[in-house]
Regions:
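Active-site neighborhood of phospho(di)ester-bond hydrolases with catalytic His/Asp-centered motifs
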Residues: 241-243, 300-307, 357, 362-366, ...
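Bacterial N-terminal signal peptides that target proteins for export
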Residues: 1-7
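Active-site-proximal segments of metal-dependent phosphoesterases and phosphodiesterases across multiple
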Residues: 491-556
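Metal-dependent phosphoesterase/phosphodiesterase active-site architecture
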Residues: 125-293, 300-301, 363, 383-517, ...
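Core catalytic region of metal-dependent phosphoesterases/phosphodiesterases
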Residues: 276-388
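Short, solvent-exposed loop/turn and secondary-structure capping segments
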Residues: 250-255, 312-318, 322-323, 333-334, ...
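Active-site environment of divalent metal-dependent phosphoester hydrolases
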Residues: 310-312, 368-374, 493-494, 528-532, ...
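Bacterial Sec-dependent N-terminal signal peptides
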Residues: 9, 15-58, 80-103, 111-126
Length: 701
């Protein structure tokens, strides 16, 4: 009966599945040499130069949120002068690039060929004695880390860091044997299935490299006159954002891996790259940390905009925690064995994650962090199925299930005992594992609160968690007038965004406080705001936030693609920016830098990074699998019937998304805000210009 109830719960939301976002384009912290300032429940976080005595205002609905007062890094507040890294002039290579790089990637698919104890975080291994701004595919082997007498490998990286300013992946389709049109036709007819990953290369499904994307400068919000981008000023904040890693326990019996293709479900829950989801996220963490280490000052903080888990499972949260904090990651569940003998040769093998280091991070909870597969509330039937030993038929005891649904929409998991990790469907027996227990929203928020790293709680507060909410306000850079407001946009029912009136009232109070204090405001949430359709509508939300001229940007995830939008009210506006996911192509995270030019002008640099993984690695394979998946679920909204033309449209759509990848978003703030900013000491080094824009990538000889 429980299985029947589960099936009803799932099928009642079948129109939402499309794997949620894809339709939208207790352990202690390790010992760290950094002071922590933790604000106890009961008050607004202290702002620079302010006490809190008069800040409590009516209308908050009793949900006043404390925050964490940020943890300043040594030297981040006042480092001045030149970057400590010697860099070469910006290359003119783009002018001489082969024009073929700009063509869709057709036919070039084959061109590139119980918790373990947490150790204190290691320093970054030394790089080879060569220009640290030049990277190629020659990998740095970081060797192993010994924990409790066991040697665990650390993932290799390219020999120096790079960003998508230098190079990026592009999807490919077609090979010497099969044209792009042939491949699209095979997919459309069901003769080539998304689960046939061993055949991807044969059909040219994967990636090749193309030149990087320069910053797209957008000055739309400069309301009077544009003096042009100065590329200098004061660096107010330098931080990293990562979103939607959707860490997957690919062996869980309650996954919907047996969804192949159906007219009712546009895209499958199956991801070929899902078996490497921990490796993908760990490589993003490593890449971000290495860039931070190479900068003249480290990142001030990091933002994690939700969906860290795919199925809200306990072990998925634990793997995320380990990769952020540092320690041994074993992406295995059920029977803990070594199906392919030897270390570091299958996706279940344990490895050592170096973690984010001493960079504080702040969380915004996502729908996949608290809902079954991201779109329906966790019920007892889900829990029973996830920790059980049998793959449950989604339609068991559900007589009204129609044949079309049954054909392409069911449960299953990827079998690690086979090198091709085929999907095993309903009825398959597997080892039970209590660590797969799905978490409710409150349990998920508690997991985030107790996660390792800094600051304690990662912005969250236990009193607010107890009420089922994950919103808060904090000052991520201690002693500086920059306020971070984190919203909880989860409806708790489906994958869509929602904004409860009580939270909206709390937000208005926080914005009033920031306005009175002349502070710069950054918002973050998992969802973008266009989907707000409850009591608080998208239009109402935009009008509220845009009426505060000190709000400069709202940072989101969820949609698995890059976008930038102006939100306005009367004569003022702010930027809302969405970041692509880690788990799906193009698998990117993002570096932000907020720069004050002077005269009230703010420049927000956005630079996307891909995982700096060498060719042939698990992560490189995963990115190629992710690119291939676009062709199995990428036909939504495409009316073109010619297969070859349809392939080109999918490639062109991917290229169009890249226009929102690297950006400089410009805006103005009112006089009281910039005069307040000018009272503080800031770094003169614009890391985006002095480091990120000067990196180079060279192919290995």
């Amino acid at each position: 009966m429980k299985h029947a109830l589960w099936a009803i719960a799932v099928l009642s939301t079948a129109s939402l599945v499309a794997c949620s976002e894809n339709l939208d384009s207790d352990h202690s912290s390790p010992v760290l040499d950094r002071d922590q300032q933790i604000h106890k429940p009961g008050g607004e976080p202290s702002a620079p130069g302010h006490d809190n005595k008069d800040d409590d205002k009516p209308g908050t609905g009793g949900v006043d949120r404390p925050g964490t007062g940020g943890d300043d890094k040594p030297g981040t507040g006042g480092s001045e002068g030149d970057s400590t890294i010697t860099v070469n002039p910006t290359p003119d290579a783009d002018k001489d690039k082969d024009k073929d790089d700009e063509k869709p990637g057709i036919g070039d698919g084959d061109k590139d060929d119980d918790k373990d104890p947490i150790d204190p975080i290691d320093p970054t291994p030394s790089l080879p004695d060569k220009d640290p701004t030049k990277a190629d595919d020659a990998a740095i082997d970081y060797g192993t880390k010994t924990v409790d007498g066991v040697d665990y490998p650390i993932q290799s990286m390219t020999n120096a860091p790079y960003t998508t300013l230098q190079r990026r992946h592009k999807p490919t389709i077609g090979s010497a044997q099969y044209s792009a049109g042939d491949v699209v036709k095979l997919i459309a007819n069901g003769d080539l299935k998304v689960t046939q990953k061993k055949d991807y290369k044969l059909y040219g499904l994967g990636t090749s490299y193309t030149q990087g994307k320069p910053w797209n400068v957008k000055s739309d919000l400069l309301r009077w006159g544009d003096p042009g981008l100065k590329r200098k000023g004061k660096s107010l904040a330098y931080f990293w954002q990562v979103s939607d890693p959707q860490i997957i326990d690919a062996q869980s019996p309650c996954r919907m891996e047996a969804v192949v293709r159906s007219p009712y479900v546009v895209s499958s829950a199956y991801r070929a790259q899902g078996i490497y989801s921990t490796h993908m996220f760990d490589m993003h963490v490593q890449t971000a940390r290495r860039i931070s280490d190479h900068s003249s000052r480290p990142f001030d903080f990091a933002l994690v905009t939700g969906d860290i888990a795919d199925n809200a499972q306990t072990n998925e949260f634990d793997w995320f925690d380990r990769m952020m904090s540092g320690g041994v990651v074993e992406p295995d569940s059920g029977k803990r064995d070594d199906p392919i003998a030897g270390p570091n040769n299958d996706f279940t093998d344990p490895y050592y994650a170096r973690g984010l280091g001493n960079i504080p991070w702040y969380i915004a909870i996502g729908n996949h962090d608290n809902l079954y597969m991201g779109f329906t509330p966790i019920q007892d039937a889900h829990r029973e199925a996830c920790i059980g030993d049998t793959v449950v038929d989604l339609f068991d005891s559900f007589p009204v299930a129609s044949a079309p649904f049954r054909e392409g929409y069911n449960n299953g998991f990827q079998d690690a005992s086979d090198p091709d990790s085929p999907v095993r469907g309903p009825g398959t027996k597997t080892a039970a594992d209590a660590r797969r227990m799905p978490l409710t929203k409150i349990e998920a928020l508690q997991k985030f609160y107790n996660a390792g790293g800094i600051p304690q709680g990662h912005g969250l507060d236990l009193d607010t968690i107890a009420q089922g909410w994950g919103y808060y306000a904090t000052y991520p850079i201690e002693g500086k007038p920059i306020k971070l407001i984190t919203l909880d946009t989860n409806s708790g029912k489906f994958s869509e965004a929602d904004m409860a009136p009580v939270q909206n009232a709390w937000l208005k109070n926080q914005l009033d406080i920031a306005k009175d204090r002349h502070e710069l405001v950054i918002l973050q949430s998992h969802h973008g705001t266009s989907g707000f359709n409850g009591e608080v509508t998208a239009q109402g939300f935009h009008q509220l936030v845009a009426s505060y001229e000190n709000v400069i940007v709202h940072i989101t995830g969820h949609g698995h693609s890059n976008s930038s939008t102006i939100r306005t009210s009367k004569d003022h506006g702010y930027w809302e920016v969405m970041l692509a996911s880690v788990v799906d192509f193009p698998s990117q995270s993002r570096i932000f830098e907020i720069v004050y030019e002077g005269d009230g002008i703010i420049d927000i640099y956005l630079t996307n990074i891909e995982p700096n993984a060498p060719r042939g690695s698990f992560v490189d394979t995963a990115v190629q699998y992710a690119a291939a998946r676009r062709f199995f679920g990428g036909f939504k909204g495409i009316t073109e019937t010619d297969p070859a033309k349809r392939a080109i449209i999918i490639l062109e759509n991917a290229e169009a998304e890249s226009e929102h990848m690297n950006l400089v978003l410009r805006t103005r703030v009112p006089k009281d805000v910039y005069e307040n900013l000018e009272k503080y000491k800031w770094s003169n080094v614009i890391e985006s210009e002095t480091l990120l824009n000067k990196l180079k990538f060279e192919e290995s000889k």
